[in-house]
Structures are given as C-alpha cells and as structure tokens.
Amino acid sequence: RFAIGGCAYSVANILGRAGASVTFVTPVGEQGVFGGFAAAQLAKLPFARPVLLPNEANGCCYCLVEANGERTFMSIHGAEYSFDPAWMARYAAERYAYGYVCGLEIEEKTGGLLVDYMKNAPVETWLYAPGPRGAGIDRARTDAIFALHPILHLSGSEAGALSGRDGLDDALLALHERTQAPIIATVGALGARVLLDKDTLLTVPGYPSSSVVDTIGAGDAHAGAVMLGLSRGMTLADAAALANRVCAKVVETEGATLSDEDFAALGLRED
C-alpha cells in the first residue's frame, strides 16, 4: 500500500499533531505517481511547507517487513533528497529553538549546501540523525556538522559504525569527543542510552508494547518526541522517556503514522 512517510515527515508529524509550533520544509518532485501522491498528502498537513519541483521526479521507499516486525528499506532517491538554500530564504527572520536534519540528505550531491545552511541557520540547537549510512558520509561534512554541537540521535548499531567502537558506551564517548554535546542512542525494547556529558551516561528504560506489528518510522517518531519534550522544557532524560512511550505505540501500528485514536491516547496534544 502507499503511505506518506520519511524521516523528517515522521519527526514533524509527532510535533505538529501534538500542537507544537513546527515548520516542515521538504522538496517534492511532481513528476510520476509518487510525487503526486506525496504532494496531495502533504497538502493536508497544516505544518507542512512542501517545495514543489514540477520538472523533477519524486522517489519512494519500499519497506519490507519481517515476521518479527523488523524492516528493510529499499529507497529510490528523487527530488525529496535534494536541497537548495533558496528554499529557506522565507524563513530567515524566524527563530527556531530546535532543527532536525538526517544523514540521508547530507550524503547527496547537494548535502554540502545543506551543511553550509546549517552553519548560519536561525536554529539554536540541531538534532542530527546520521542514520544507518552515516558512517559512509563524507568525513568533512560530518565534521562540519559535529562542530555545530548537535544532539545526536541514532541507534546503538549506528553509534558503533559511526564511531568505529565496539561497546555502546565507548561509542557514545568517542562521538561526544567530536560533538561536545549530548547523545541519545535507541536500543530497541530496552529503551535508550543517554549521554549527558563525558561523566554521565544513563539508561532510560523502554516502554512495553502489547505487540510489535512493524518498526517502520519508530526511530523517527522517537526523535520527534525527544524534540517535543525538549521544546516543553523537559530534561533530555525525561524527553527520552516520553519518546520511548511514543515509540512503543508506533511499533504496535502498521506503518509510520499513528491513527488519530492512537495518537490521542498518548495525551501529547497541547492547544
């Protein structure tokens, strides 16, 4: 089945539906069936600011789900992975407490432009999710992002690959040496390992799920809930606990987007 999804979409979806003030900027290629579908779905979201590119094709992601709920992604990259700083000119006067970027866009040919934008963007703190391909991103781009002291949000395996270290805590400490900022590493049903500083690492226990349907979008929803908690003045540990609860609900659902009923049950909405 077709469904709207993707990293930043899932992050913004949690924030927007919870009543947070969020601006979701994403390019959409209008060529082909995928672009038309994506544009139509995004038009329904009050927080979405799609940049329509009429002469470019949009990509898609095929999600293969195993019996235990784990998933494998096969992506066809299109316009949605691109970036042009001109798209952000209308937001230059805004001020954002937090901004989100994932590594899939950084590795693209326009990724250097995105990194340059991040350096001078009206964003106080970046949350950066390097993703499963983060270790393969150009080192200079990664170093430039790390110099901005972003909060890293990644899985335990991603932390190991990106740092080149075997143990999770060793990996987080090695990454912290480069970012000098907190880190959240998700560890599945066990919850999250949170590094606050070089002397403080703690485990935030997972929240039980009644059943696991699939894990599509779970990590992205976790990142969105972390940003939601931080935007409401929570500590990073409390924000991670909130995110664990949201993540537990997402894995009980088919696909990346919670139904209105399931989202309401989380009690996140503030008007």
Residue spans of the language-model regions?
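Ribokinase/PfkB-type carbohydrate-kinase core domain
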Residues: 39-53, 59-60, 65-202, 234
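Substrate-binding N-lobe of the ribokinase-like
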Residues: 1-60, 269-270
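Conserved phosphate-binding/catalytic region of the ribokinase-like
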Residues: 168-271
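Short helix-capping/linker segments at secondary-structure and domain boundaries
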Residues: 19-23, 70, 233-235
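Short, conserved phosphate/pyrophosphate- and ester-handling motifs at nucleotide-, phospho-/glycolipid
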Residues: 15, 155, 219
